[in-house]
Amino acid sequence: VNSRRSWVIFGIGVFAYLVAVMQRTSIGVAGVAATERFHVSAAVLSSMAVVQLIVYAAMQVPVGVLIDRVGSRALMIAGTALMVVGQVTVAFAPTIALAIVGRILVGAGDATVFTSLMRLVNSWFRGRIVPQLSQWIGNIGQLGQVLSAVPFALLLHESGWTTAFLSAASVSVVALVGIVAAIRDRPVGSSEGPRPATWRESIRQLRISLARPGTQLGFWSHFTTQSSGTVFSLMWGLPFMVFALGIDPAEASGLLIVSVVAGLIAGPILGLLTARFPLRRSNLVLAIVGMMGIVWALLLLWPGTPPLWLLILVLVAIGIGGPGSLIGFDFARTSNPLHSLGSANGIVNVGGFLASFVMMFLIGVALDAQNTAHTVAGLYALDSFRWAFAVQYVIVGLGVVFLVRARRRTRRRLAEEEGIEVGPLWVALVDVWRRRDGRGPGENVQ
């Protein structure tokens, strides 16, 4: 472990994930083109992305179980091949129905890559570098969004729908070759590989993973932090910027990169904080959620057209939410044995995408409900988006309630099993201040 071979596998795996993110987000920058190509309403258009995410989320637990049974390599090969077929289907789709079928295949293939890669990292690396590598997976992977926002969007604009989606499919072919050639499930001699088991035994292990409070805490952490950015980048961000704010489509696609850059900067910092203060990871999650809530409120309540700097602030906030969601997988890592980590990661990964497709669909419904004139201008009006985007507060607020409950149970189990008491953050900060001020021994902020 932690060898040169480990880094080769990490690099190829991250490239495969980057390509998967590009395939996932390609429909976001194609939203306007899809409206013109298929002549459909906002709700129908959103269903193309929603169905993709439903499939992605529904596949997470089965994929996690299969990773524990047959290994990451087989799942990554099958998933990447599915994405090739899916994007080719979208490229030639004459109707929205066939395009949705293609996106279903993309969602099914995409579902295998990230969870498989997280398991590979835990098999090939050890120590405090693991949570930092998890952040780098998310950060580098999000460069796939840059590929969809810039070269893919330009190709879509210049060469058309079919050429753009066929080109995207060809990149997955390259990733597939790399996976077949280099990815292996575990180091030679390791006993921590896939474990053949009956489905009854696999389901029993899944239930055990799901029952662990730390797994549930990871689920709700992912639920609350990832969804806003996914909804914006995958579906509603481009129509909002182009129609509601009057931004040029090419410039709007470029602005989506702001979120990626913010995530690239924040990810390593969050990785270091996660490794340094493992008992305060939930405080990081809640701080990120609070920050996103504040900047969204500023944007939605701004009188008139919001200024560009405020839009950029929102993009930065949701960009930080991306690496923030990866903290959920660190909860799974520290709460589950390696042989069942695939199942636990699958459960966690459902969270953000479950929130995303519910939020995405409800925003589409809210936009349609306000479009009494039945025009594109009315559909994507600024005031319509204000009310539609407010749906986020309901979904994320529900997630925060369950997150706090799961944290309470996780800390209770930590106290019972390991004798570690985690007090409120403000108490720990006061103790640290007293220690530095020489007034007392203080308590570790962890």
Predicted ranges, named:
Residues V1-N2, R184-F219, E421-G438:
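Juxtamembrane intracellular "pre-TM" segments in multi-pass secondary transporters
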Residues I27-G28, P213-P268, F357-G364:
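Extracytoplasmic gate region of multi-pass secondary transporters
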Residues H39, G71, F92-L98, G109, ...:
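Helix-breaking motifs and short loop linkers at transmembrane-helix boundaries and internal kinks
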Residues A58-A97:
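Conserved MFS/SLC helix-loop-helix module at the cytosolic interface between two early adjacent transmembrane helices
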Residues M59-G71, A266-R280:
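Helix-to-loop junctions at the C-terminal end of transmembrane segments
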Residues R69-G79, A275-G290:
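Cytoplasmic membrane-interface "Motif A"-like loop-to-helix N-cap segments
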Residues G102-G141:
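Cytoplasmic helix-loop-helix junction between adjacent transmembrane helices
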Residues W136-P187:
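Helix-loop-helix hairpin linking two adjacent transmembrane segments in secondary transporters
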